[in-house]
Design a protein with these regions (language model features):
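Ser/Thr-glycine-rich phosphate-binding loops at phosphate-binding pockets of nucleotides
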Residues: 1-3, 73, 97-98, 186-188
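Conserved ATP-binding/catalytic segment of the ANL
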Residues: 22-27, 36-97
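Active-site loops of AMP-binding adenylate-forming
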Residues: 1-17, 57-60, 139
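Conserved C-terminal "lid"/linker of ANL adenylate-forming enzymes
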Residues: 120-122, 160-188
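AMP-binding/adenylate-forming catalytic core of the ANL superfamily
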Residues: 47, 52-53, 76-167
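Short Gly/Ser/Thr- and Asp/Glu-enriched loop/turn motifs at secondary-structure junctions
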Residues: 1, 90, 126-130, 171-173, ...
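Conserved A3 ("GATE") glycine/threonine-rich loop of ANL adenylate-forming enzymes
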Residues: 1-11, 24-28, 128-130
Length: 189
């Protein structure tokens, strides 16, 4: 839909931690639709690198663009005062906390994925609004280290507590469940 780039940071300008950079000057524009009080909203773009539409799919094309021609990326993000873009998550994956707070599971997953022995993770919300982290351990690394299942469980619980210390109260992970294999990335036919 948009290629090859929307944003980047030239080497000589320096970067900002967590930022995707600035829109390509003179080529791309980025704005945030319906920002909340933190300035986070849907990232929309327009410019030379944006598609014109989906081939023979007028309904999909209509859904992909705003009425005034901006491409909906499906990302949630914000722009800082210097024009740097920060992606917070995906529109379809945002969760609502118990008091209506926005929870971006990708941000929590990024913290979990930096824990020792974690290959990948997925944060889900239960019916009671509690957050659960499904974690696929790096079993090759676990085996190489000689950890027992009990030691791995204990390590994951300690890591859950560490991650929670970095999160707001409404983002706390209640439980960690170990997953036996990598998560499916594409649907099977």
């Amino acid at each position: 839909e948009c290629a090859p780039l929307i944003t980047f940071t030239p080497y000589d300008e320096g970067s900002k931690l967590g930022s995707c950079g600035k829109p390509l000057e003179g080529i791309m524009e980025v704005k945030i639709l319906n920002p909340n009080e933190e300035g986070i909203g849907e990232v929309v773009v327009r410019g030379e690198n944006t598609m014109q539409g989906y081939y023979k799919k007028p309904d999909a094309t209509k859904d992909a663009f705003t009425e005034d021609g901006w491409l909906r990326t499906g990302d949630l993000g914000c722009l800082d005062s210097d024009g740097f873009l920060y992606i917070k998550g995906r529109c379809k994956t945002m969760l609502l906390g118990p008091s209506g707070q926005n929870i971006y599971p990708e941000e929590i997953e990024a913290k979990i994925n930096n824990m020792p022995f974690v290959l990948e993770s997925l944060v889900l919300q239960q019916e009671d609004n509690r957050l659960v982290a499904l974690i696929c351990p790096d079993y090759n690394e676990v085996d190489a280290s000689g950890l027992t299942r009990e030691q791995l469980d204990e390590l994951m619980e300690d890591s859950r507590k560490q991650v929670n210390s970095e999160l707001a109260a409404y983002e706390q992970i209640s439980i960690v469940k170990l997953y036996p294999h990598e998560f499916e990335k594409t649907p099977k036919k």
